[in-house]
From Swiss-Prot:
Domain named TGS: residues: 1-61
Record gene name: thrS
Quaternary data: Homodimer.
One GO CC term, this protein: cytosol
Protein known as: Threonine--tRNA ligase
Cofactor note: Binds 1 zinc ion per subunit.
DNA damage as UniProt keyword: no
One Pfam family from the record: tRNA_SAD
Catalytic activity reported: tRNA(Thr) + L-threonine + ATP = L-threonyl-tRNA(Thr) + AMP + diphosphate + H(+)
Keyword Aminoacyl-tRNA synthetase among UniProt keywords: yes
InterPro entries: aa-tRNA-synt_IIb (IPR002314), aa-tRNA-synth_II (IPR006195), aa-tRNA-synth_II/BPL/LPL (IPR045864), Anticodon-bd (IPR004154), Anticodon-bd_dom_sf (IPR036621), Beta-grasp_dom_sf (IPR012675), TGS (IPR004095), TGS-like (IPR012676)
Length: 642
C-alpha cells in the first residue's frame, strides 16, 4: 500500500502499485491530461512508471523545464519515425535534446534538400496529430540488440556494444511501427508534440571523430504550445537580423578568409572598436590597481609540460620547432604570468600582486566549430592573475566581482546569472583548504549581494570557481566572466613568496577574466546593439554634410573642430542630394549626422540629426562639441533619442 507524498506535503495512499499517471488522475482529470512524466524520489521517470513503495512524487507537465525537455526528446523520436517512413533505408544514430530543441544524426545516402526537410516536417506533423500512445518496453540487452540488428540499425547496435552494460535493461520506446532506444523519460502520447519546426541540417561525424563517417544532423525546435513556438521563431528572426557576421560586413568592421581560418582581419572601423574597448578595460585596471604586462606568444614545450597544459591541451595547441627545440604558441596567459612573478624575491608585503594582460592566444579549434567572432582560433584575452595569500582570497574575489559588475553595467547588461562550482571528486589539496576556499568565494558573493546557483562537483581539480553568464536582449546566454582559484599552477612552476614567518610559501593564484575574449565580446556587443554602438564605441561618431558646394569650407572647419576635440568625425562633400547622404550614413549607423546649409553657415551653427531619424534642431558648434564630449566621456549607452 504505497503512500505518495506530493510537493505540498499532502499524502495519498493506494491499495496497489500505482503509476505516475494514476496518481495524477487521482488529483484531477486536468492534471492527468497534462502529465508528461514524474519525479519519483528525485528521479525523472515515465508517466507509466509504477510506484510500488512509499515515495515522494512531483507531476511533470509541459510548464516545467523538465517537461519541455522531455517533449523535445520525444520530438527527436518523432523525427526518426517520420524519416523511416519517407526513407526506410535511413540508419538512426543519436537524437539528444539541446538548448531550445533537439537534433538527430542520420545516415542516409542522399543529401537532404530544403524540400526534403519540408516533407519530413509535414510527415512529423501528420504522425503527431494521430495522437498515438508512446509505449515503453524494458528489455534485456540481448533483446534490444536483436531488435536493432534485425532492422539493420548499425549505430544503435554499436551503442549497445560499446556503451551499455550487458546486464543493463534498455528502454525501447515504440512509436507505432518505429522503435527507438533511450533512457527516457518520454511523453506518454504524441498530443504533446504538435508544436515544432525543423530548422537546418549540417554534417556531423559519428562519435565526433573525423575518422568516422560523416552523418547528416537535422536540427529542430519544439515548444509546449503554438504561442511559445512563434515567439521563439520571432526571436530567431530578430537574431538573424542582428547576426554580427552580417552587420560586420555591412559596417566594414572585419573579415575572415580561408587562408587564415578562425583568425580575424580587423578593418579600420572594427579596430577602432577594439582599441576603445581596450582603453576602457585599461581604465578599469588602473581603478582596481593592476599591473599590465606582456608575455611572449610562444614558449618551449618544457614549460608547458611543467605547467600541465601539454598533457591536457596538446591537441588544441599550435606548435612549431627551431634549432631542435619544440615550442607551443600560447593558448592562455597564466604560465607566462607565473614566470614574471618568479623574477625577483617576493615577500608577503608584495601581495596581492595583480597582473593583467591583453594576451594574444591561439587554440586549434575544429574548423567546423568556427563561427565569426564568437568562435575563433586567434583571440585576445582580457586576462588577469592575482597572486595572493590564502587569507586574502575573499577580499580579492570580492574586488573581482565588483569589477565584473562595474564593467558589465557600462554595456547595459543587467541580467547576469552567477554559478559557484565546488570541489570535484578528483582534486588536489586538503578538504580543509577546499572548505576555506569555497567559503571565501561564497562569502565574497554574499558580501556583494549576488544571488548564485551552487554547482557541486563542477569546479576544476585545482580550485573552485565563479562563472558569470550574460543574458542579452534576446535572452541568449553568454558565459564571459570567470573568477577561478588555482592551488596547483604556482607550485608546479616554482612560485613562492617569503611569509611573515620567514618561510617560503606558495601563493594562491586567482585567474580572472571579465570580457573573456575581446573578439567574442565585440561579437556579442554587435548583436546586442544591432550595430548601433554607443557613441564612445562608434567608429565614426559624426559625419558632417554640405547641401551645396558653397558650404564645403565651413564643413571642413566643423570637422576639424570636432576632431581636435577628440570626436571622430568626417566630411561628406559628395555632389549628392542631402537625402541620399543621410540615408547612406543612417544605414552605416553613424550616431550623429550634421547638416550645413547657408543659414547654418551664416549663424555658425549646425543642424543635428540622429541615426534613428530624430531631428534635434540647430546647435552652436561649441555647444555640440560639449554635449558629444560629455556623452563620450560618461560612456552613455544610447545617443539622446534612444
Amino acid at each position: 500500500m504505497p503512500v505518495i507524498t506530493l510537493p505540498d506535503g499532502s499524502q495519498r495512499q493506494f491499495e496497489n502499485a500505482v503509476s505516475v499517471l494514476d496518481v495524477a488522475a487521482s488529483i484531477g482529470a486536468g492534471l492527468a491530461k497534462a502529465c508528461i512524466a514524474g519525479r519519483v524520489n528525485g528521479e525523472l521517470v515515465d508517466a507509466c512508471e509504477l510506484i510500488e513503495t512509499d515515495a515522494t512524487l512531483s507531476i511533470i507537465t509541459a510548464k516545467d523545464q523538465e517537461g519541455l525537455e522531455i517533449l523535445r526528446h520525444s520530438c527527436a523520436h518523432l523525427l526518426g519515425h517520420a524519416i523511416k517512413q519517407l526513407w526506410p533505408q535511413t540508419k538512426m544514430a543519436i537524437g539528444p535534446v539541446i538548448d531550445n530543441g533537439f537534433y538527430y544524426d542520420v545516415d542516409l545516402d542522399q543529401m537532404l534538400t530544403e524540400e526534403d526537410i519540408q516533407a519530413l516536417e509535414a510527415r512529423m506533423l501528420e504522425l503527431a496529430q494521430k495522437d498515438y500512445d508512446v509505449v515503453k518496453k524494458t528489455v534485456s540487452w540481448q533483446e534490444a540488440r536483436d531488435v536493432f540488428e534485425s532492422r539493420s540499425e548499425t549505430y544503435k547496435v554499436a551503442i549497445l556494444d560499446e556503451n551499455i552494460a550487458r546486464d543493463d535493461k534498455p528502454g525501447l520506446y515504440h512509436h507505432e511501427e518505429y522503435i527507438d532506444m533511450c533512457r527516457g523519460p518520454h511523453v506518454p502520447n504524441m498530443r504533446f508534440c504538435h508544436h515544432f519546426k525543423l530548422q537546418k541540417t549540417s554534417g556531423a561525424y559519428w562519435r565526433g571523430d573525423a575518422k568516422n563517417k560523416m552523418l547528416q544532423r537535422i536540427y529542430g525546435t519544439a515548444w509546449a504550445d503554438k504561442k511559445q513556438l512563434n515567439a521563439y521563431l520571432q526571436r530567431l528572426e530578430e537574431a538573424a537580423k542582428r547576426d554580427h557576421r552580417k552587420i560586420g560586413k555591412q559596417l566594414d568592421l572585419y573579415h575572415m578568409q580561408e587562408e587564415a581560418p578562425g583568425m580575424v582581419f580587423w578593418h579600420n572601423d572594427g579596430w577602432i572598436i577594439f582599441r576603445e574597448l581596450e582603453t576602457f578595460i585599461r581604465q578599469k585596471l588602473r581603478e582596481y590597481d593592476y599591473e599590465e604586462v606582456k608575455g611572449p606568444f610562444m614558449m618551449d614545450r618544457v614549460l608547458w609540460e611543467r605547467s600541465g597544459h601539454w598533457d591536457k591541451y596538446a591537441d588544441a595547441m599550435f606548435t612549431t620547432s627551431s634549432e631542435n627545440r619544440e615550442y607551443a604558441i600560447k593558448p592562455m596567459n597564466c604560465p607566462g604570468h607565473v614566470q614574471i612573478f618568479n623574477q625577483g624575491l617576493k615577500s608577503y608585503r608584495d601581495l596581492p600582486l595583480r597582473m593583467a594582460e591583453f594576451g594574444s592566444c591561439h587554440r586549434n579549434e575544429p574548423s567546423g566549430s568556427l563561427h565569426g567572432l564568437m568562435r575563433v582560433r586567434g583571440f585576445t584575452q582580457d586576462d588577469a592573475h592575482i597572486f595572493c595569500a590564502e587569507n586574502q582570497i575573499q577580499d580579492e574575489v570580492s574586488a573581482c566581482i565588483r569589477m565584473v559588475y562595474d564593467t558589465y553595467s557600462t554595456f547595459g547588461f543587467k541580467n547576469i546569472a552567477v554559478k559557484l562550482s565546488t570541489r570535484p571528486e578528483k582534486r588536489i589539496g586538503s578538504d580543509e583548504m577546499w572548505d576555506r576556499a569555497e567559503e571565501a568565494l561564497s562569502a565574497a558573493l554574499k558580501h556583494n549581494n549576488i544571488e548564485f546557483d551552487l554547482q557541486p562537483g563542477e569546479g576544476a581539480f585545482y580550485g573552485p570557481k565563479i562563472e558569470f553568464t550574460l543574458h542579452d536582449c534576446l535572452d541568449r546566454a553568454w558565459q564571459c566572466g570567470t573568477v577561478q582559484l588555482d592551488f596547483a599552477l604556482p607550485g608546479r612552476l616554482g612560485a613562492t613568496y617569503v611569509g611573515e614567518d620567514n618561510d617560503r610559501h606558495v601563493p594562491v593564484m586567482i585567474h580572472r577574466a571579465i570580457l573573456g575574449s575581446m573578439e567574442r565580446f565585440i561579437g556579442i556587443l554587435t548583436e546586442e546593439t544591432a550595430g548601433y554602438f554607443p557613441l564612445w564605441l562608434a567608429p565614426l561618431q559624426a559625419v558632417v554634410m554640405n547641401i551645396t558646394d558653397n558650404q564645403a569650407d565651413y564643413v571642413k572647419e566643423v570637422v576639424n573642430t570636432l576632431n581636435e576635440s577628440g570626436i571622430r568625425a568626417k566630411a561628406d562633400l559628395r555632389n549628392e542630394k542631402i537625402g541620399f547622404k543621410i540615408r547612406e550614413h543612417t544605414l552605416k549607423r553613424v550616431p550623429y549626422m550634421l547638416v550645413c546649409g547657408d543659414k547654418e553657415m551664416e549663424a555658425g551653427e549646425i543642424a543635428v540629426r540622429t541615426r534613428r531619424g530624430v531631428d534635434l534642431g540647430k546647435f552652436k558648434v561649441t555647444d555640440l562639441v560639449e554635449q558629444l564630449r560629455k556623452e563620450i566621456s560618461t560612456r552613455v549607452l544610447n545617443v539622446v533619442e534612444e
